[in-house]
């Protein structure tokens, strides 16, 4: 009985050492997250379909954050905001998004909606990660002028 106590204690200690992720980057497939796959594809291919899919992934990551901190991963709000503040993105989304992709937004005026949402995302990035203010504040100023 005395020889089992160290084994049981060791098992308990080792089982409590599991790590939990601070941020959720999307489901993985072979170690590559869905976000990484879509981001790589949309920035390299620049196809309307891949950009529409990326917008949906960003929106999900921002509105339903997972992980122990329950906030979007660092840089996601800024990337999403930058994409939305691009004037071509709203037009591209209006023309090429599927019905289910469009249903995540309550408006059909994507130009105005994306501009507001883009600025909001940049502000969220600074709120979640204050150290990013040095970079994000001038970027907001430049993009919204």
Can you annotate each of these PLM segments?
Residues 1-2, 18:
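N-terminal hydrophobic targeting signals that begin at the initiator methionine
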Residues 109-130:
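TPR/TPR-like (Sel1-like) alpha-helical repeat modules
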Residues 69, 129-140:
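Boundary/linker segments of alpha-helical solenoid repeat arrays
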Residues 2-10:
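Sec-dependent signal peptide recognition
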Residues 13-16:
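C-terminal motif of bacterial Sec signal peptides marking the signal peptidase cleavage site
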Residues 18-77, 85-105, 111-113, 144:
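N-terminal alpha-helical interaction modules that lie
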